[in-house]
């Protein structure tokens, strides 16, 4: 407990000290020893001749008792002797380092902290480096040990070794093999040079590896591009009917244009068009492809469908952008619908035996169907599949009834050409939306929604 200089502190026993003739009122007005011990110099040994505390004390009439005598009996009981280390006023001051400050014990001029690496410190580091020429990478424990010995910081030691390795490498005296950075050296600030050295020395080896990796990645990209937009020739017929619904679906537009370009002539010759991969029809679509098509392009689609059959249970396993294009542009959404509508489509079975119209219902029901409000559950679509591959809810059952009515009402249109198919698709949009449209979402937002996982 310290008091400012000039503060008159009178303990209860100080009233009896007025009888002391040698120390009158000047003794009581003098600064106390606690102020002397905790003076602004920050040192415990401030009341020496020449110090500010000593001169302030001498000015008040204490020049005679402050001689270098070992007898402190001339001091009152409430004043601790500046030479007595066991006085109450000195204990707090002696707890600090005599050369450091109490507020910040590690100042720049503190001998415990070394700004520059001295000759003896570098000699220790050089000796360690000479002994470990084949592996000049000290571990974390060795760095701490060297930092304690040389009185340097851990960053200084790391930087010194990094500079030494760079210097030896520049002088072609490198006798060690570059190695990877160990885990205990990740947080060192001076290891940036080491990483640069290792990267430059491993450049040739990494070039070969990166070339191989690049070839693999190019191969994967080519496969992905083939699956996304196989041979996009630019036939924009089927996508015109839904351009107002999908402004941002450029990828799906390219994919769908390509498929419709190849399947435009097959629509008049072959009974079934090739089905692309889709999480909804990943099981039955390859069967149709094997029965009807034999071209190499369709065999590639069959392989894609086989790959997607496993993901029909978990379509979230491939959360890519082209998955949306695959779903939005699949030709045959529901190949088992022919069994559901066998009586209604028997007259047109020669034209479309498995599905009435791929461009009519396969695409636009995905965007304009009223049960799309539950678009996070693919079970809504799978209510149409007779084998029940995926789980569906009661909402899908009610939506299935409305979809069957729509398919029955539009099945008579499927004998026409592609021009009449486009007209029928517009009629389906106008017929289907006002009846039981419950979705509160804008259909233009559908294209931006990726593949959603099952709840």
Swiss-Prot record:
DNA-binding segment(s): 110-172
Chain spans, region Disordered: 172-214, 247-319, 418-455
Start-end of Acidic residues biased regions: 257-267
Keywords: Developmental protein, Differentiation, DNA-binding, Homeobox, Neurogenesis, Nucleus, Transcription, Transcription regulation
Localisation: Nucleus
Expression (tissue specificity): First expressed at gastrula stage 10 in a large region of the dorsolateral ectoderm that includes most of the prospective neural plate. Subsequently expressed in two domains, one within the anterior ectoderm (outside the neural plate) and the other within the neural plate. Within the neural plate, expression extends from the midbrain-hindbrain junction up to, and including, the spinal cord. Expressed in the placodes. Also expressed in specific and overlapping dynamic patterns with irx1 and irx3 during pronephric kidney development.
InterPro entries: HD, Homeobox_CS, Homeodomain-like_sf, Iroquois_homeo, KN_HD
A single Gene Ontology CC term: nucleus
A GO BP annotation: dorsal/ventral pattern formation
Bias-annotated ranges (Polar residues): 289-316, 420-429
CDD domains: homeodomain
Biased composition, class Basic and acidic residues, residue ranges: 192-205, 247-256
Induction: By a combination of a neural inducing signal (nog/noggin) and a posteriorizing signal (retinoic acid). Inhibited in the neural plate by foxd5.
Source taxon at top rank: Eukaryota
Gene Ontology molecular-function annotations: DNA-binding transcription factor activity, RNA polymerase II-specific; RNA polymerase II cis-regulatory region sequence-specific DNA binding
Function comment: Acts partially redundantly with other irx members in neural patterning. Required for formation of the posterior forebrain, midbrain, hindbrain, and to a lesser extent, spinal cord. Acts early in neural plate development to induce expression of some but not all proneural genes, and specify a neural precursor state. Also up-regulates repressors that prevent neuronal differentiation. Patterns the neuroectoderm in both the anterior/posterior and dorsal/ventral axes. Probably dispensable for pronephric kidney development.
Protein name: Iroquois-class homeodomain protein irx-2
Organism, scientific name: Xenopus laevis
Name of the gene encoding the protein in the UniProt record: irx2
